[in-house]
């Protein structure tokens, strides 16, 4: 005989099931901070970002000095969670900032970003924007970190060929002490690895050598920096130089290396999501990032390098990732699966 339940019990069960499913679907937030308005205003701009509050918080405060009546809710999540929040959950953020250029391009290409045009956006060079939907406000080199203290008299690598040779000839030093992003879990890590694979076949040889050394895998640059500072790591590959520079400026034991065969340069970008409830405020914040006061705060307080074609021309080994739909190639489901299979095989993770 089927058990009977009172209607209120059934209602509560249905509500509980709905809430459980909603919670299961919710994107994972790493940090959220409300910057209250400096003056009475009553409006709030909501920003979703992969950039830590410790980095962009001073830029938010600079924005509020210019716009004291606006409160800012700043939410931090991983690049894949940021993408899911907009693409899958349609969260009503007013501006999305991410270092994962490919995922930002997919949002824009799929019609999930609002067009925004102003005198400030018109001044962005063509290579740092896509249509009227996606704009870069910082360019950042992807670097190698290596412990000078642990390396001792051994030569510091200048190219991937040097690095491969160093790892092969000093396995005892590096075993269990090499770190890099996990491309299966980190959107930025996946972007760096796929772009590496397009630049040179040496990437796969390097991956195989790292795989033989029981490497450690990470989802954030700051975690790798923490571990190289404490000595847990001797080497960290594919680290955001913009994070490493400020944190290691006074640390003589760690070298920040821009490899001379090539060094990837990413563009940190922003979009106004189609789901925004205050796109005017999202556009206002974007214009601030692209204007003189915002640029000064980005450079001087956040420590992020500004968009600068001159820096690229002066250092021919820099390889900027192109902000165009070519970034979407490795987001194809089959290509992603094949790439991660090859990665796992090279790293002996199967």
Residue ranges and their predicted role:
Residues 26-106:
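Early extracytoplasmic/lumenal segment of secretory-pathway proteins
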Residues 46, 50-51, 57, 92, ...:
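Extracytoplasmic ligand-binding site segments that recognize negatively charged/polar headgroups
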Residues 71-78, 97, 213-221, 257-258:
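Short beta-strand-to-loop elements that line the ligand-binding cleft
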Residues 102-106, 229-253:
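A ligand-binding cleft/hinge motif common to bilobed small-molecule-binding domains
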Residues 122-127, 139-140, 206-211, 249-274:
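Periplasmic-binding protein-like
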Residues 143-150, 192-194, 266-278, 297:
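A bilobed periplasmic-binding-protein/Venus flytrap-type ligand-binding module shared by bacterial periplasmic
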Residues 273-330:
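Mature extracytoplasmic/periplasmic domains
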Residues 328-350:
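Conserved C-terminal helix/tail region of periplasmic/extracytoplasmic solute-binding proteins
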